[in-house]
Amino acid sequence: MQDQLISSLSSEDSSPSTPTSDAPAKRLSWSKLMQKLHSSQSLDSDSDNHSSTDDSSDSGSICIPDVSQSEFFDPTEEALCKEVVQLIALNLTDAKDGVLHCSKLLIPEKLLEHIGQELVHLSVSEPCGLRGALIDLCVEQDGSCHAAAQIAVDPYLVPTFQLTLVLRLDSRGLWPKIQGLFTGRSPASPAVRRALRLSTGFRAIKRKLYSSEELLIEEC
């Protein structure tokens, strides 16, 4: 038995050793293997982090950026606003023979556009929207304010807020020089009746009818 063991040891000592040229190759292969393992662990870690982020976003609340109320689009409300603006223009035209005492009233398209924007802006926070508006139209003339008309947007609804639009006459720029071109004579009166043109700027005064909050005044 001892002879066999000695013989076995002798045979192992006599076996050819691994060439030294293979050692660097094995070390290189081992380093590549470690790099692959490290890369695999990094990918798994990123995948776990992404998965945990998805899980937390699914289980938790969804973050929604702040959006102001004026940024919401309501087609029905916008269509109603266009109708109200047209009604305002019609009432102003009818007022030329009454409180305004003029032969012609020129209403700039830009003024109507600004009024429409202000109507949407001031009614967006109201419980009934623009339908709950009671609109007073006034025109500043000769140092005083003349009431031209009052419009209940929905006459079957109790108004929730009152909106007073104080319009101004255009007395600047080219208009005073060409105003006479629009002046006419009424058959009922030989006196010359002047033509008026509204300015694009106006004042909006809002008062809530269901609250004791202070008046909101905006220069537009």
Curated annotation (Swiss-Prot):
Residues 7-22 have a biased composition (Low complexity). It holds the Pfam family RTP801_C. GO terms for molecular function: 14-3-3 protein binding. Keywords: Apoptosis, Cytoplasm, Mitochondrion. GO terms for biological process: apoptotic process; dorsal/ventral pattern formation; negative regulation of TOR signaling; response to hypoxia. It is found in: Cytoplasm; Mitochondrion. One of its GO terms (cellular component) is cytoplasm. Gene3D superfamilies: RTP801-like. Its main location: cytoplasm. Transmembrane segments: none annotated. Residues 1-62 are annotated as: Disordered. Belongs to the DDIT4 family. Regulates cell growth, proliferation and survival via inhibition of the activity of the mammalian target of rapamycin complex 1 (mTORC1). Inhibition of mTORC1 is mediated by a pathway that involves ddit4/redd1, akt1, the tsc1-tsc2 complex and the GTPase rheb. Plays an important role in responses to cellular energy levels and cellular stress, including responses to hypoxia and DNA damage, via its effect on mTORC1 activity. Plays a role in neuronal differentiation, neuron migration during embryonic brain development and in neuronal cell death. This is DNA damage-inducible transcript 4 protein. The lineage of its organism: Eukaryota, Metazoa, Chordata, Craniata, Vertebrata.
